[in-house]
Amino acid sequence: MNEEDIISLFYAKSHLETYEVLFPLAQRGNKFATYFIGNMLISPIDQTVEADVLEGIGYLKLSAKAGYSPAFEFLGNLYAYNEKVKNDLVAAHTFFYLAALIDNKVDIGYHLMIEDEFGISEASINKSKELAEACMAVGLENCELFKE
């Protein structure tokens, strides 16, 4: 299934029905399926899937490792704003910056908004950018952000 098919399924069916279709695709590494499985596990809309934030983050990281920029943005939001996830502004900034690098939109990315909103130090910003650039250099599958 491609991205459009999965988005249509996500909004047309219950989360449980969608989960049952997407889970085998996610197991085979479909970056769109892993993103939406993660999304459903973190924020189930219709309560047909039980929330599991840690498992959801795992699926989002798989999607991000495959280069899906919305997964980086979702992870950035989780680490910056979600009360169920330990606040880590450097990680949030790095995820947002990676999304901007992937989309070639470094000048307008969410990383700039959280720099202003949270007053992140220049040292932390530089650390984040260095980590993101290192991830791009070694390949996302080898990125330090994804090592447990």
What are these regions (language model features)?
Residues 35, 58, 73, 93-97:
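Extended, hydrophobic/aromatic-rich amphipathic alpha-helical segments that build helical scaffolds
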Residues 4-5, 36-45, 74-81, 112-117:
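Hydrophobic face of amphipathic alpha-helices that form TPR/SEL1-like repeat modules
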Residues 13-14, 27-32, 44-47, 65-69, ...:
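Short helix-capping/linker turns of helical repeat alpha-solenoids
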Residues 35-36, 53, 73-74, 108-112, ...:
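Alpha-solenoid helical repeat scaffolds
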Residues 10-20, 48-59, 86-94:
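Structural signature of tandem alpha-helical TPR/SEL1-like repeats
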Residues 2-28:
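Alpha-helical segment of the N-proximal tetratricopeptide repeat
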Residues 109-148:
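Terminal, low-structured helical/coil segments at or just beyond the last alpha-helical repeat
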